[in-house]
């Protein structure tokens, strides 16, 4: 998990504690990509592409260099509900999942694997 600007902040630590997430052998939390050996992981979460200053070109290079890894890319949103950055990101991802008010949903406009739906995420 590459936490970017949130790494080590009280809000981030509270978030991890609330979810019961603690670093262990299957989870590594770092501030930036340079602190992570990507090839050692099956899944890499980038939170967020905006705070990590990752461009669509950077990501394409990362995908080419690490073809066996899966990436979950978080993007900051605008007040109008769009994600920030280049529209080229839409062509790089398999599924776009929108999250708002503890509800995660796909809109059907970008889901290579079919269907659309929603799920509610309850935070304790």
Labelled PLM ranges:
Residues 1-31:
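Conserved P-loop
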């Amino acid at each position: 998990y590459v936490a970017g600007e949130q790494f080590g902040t009280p809000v981030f630590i509270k978030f991890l504690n609330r979810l019961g997430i603690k670093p262990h052998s299957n989870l590594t939390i770092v501030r930036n990509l340079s602190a992570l050996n990507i090839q050692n992981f099956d899944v890499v979460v980038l939170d967020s592409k905006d705070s990590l200053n990752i461009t669509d070109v950077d990501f394409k290079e990362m995908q080419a260099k690490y073809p066996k890894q899966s990436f979950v890319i978080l993007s900051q949103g605008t007040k109008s509900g769009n994600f920030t950055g280049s529209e080229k990101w839409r062509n790089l991802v398999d599924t776009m999942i929108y999250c708002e008010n503890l509800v995660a949903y796909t809109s059907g406009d970008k889901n290579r694997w079919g269907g659309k739906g929603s799920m509610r995420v309850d935070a304790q």
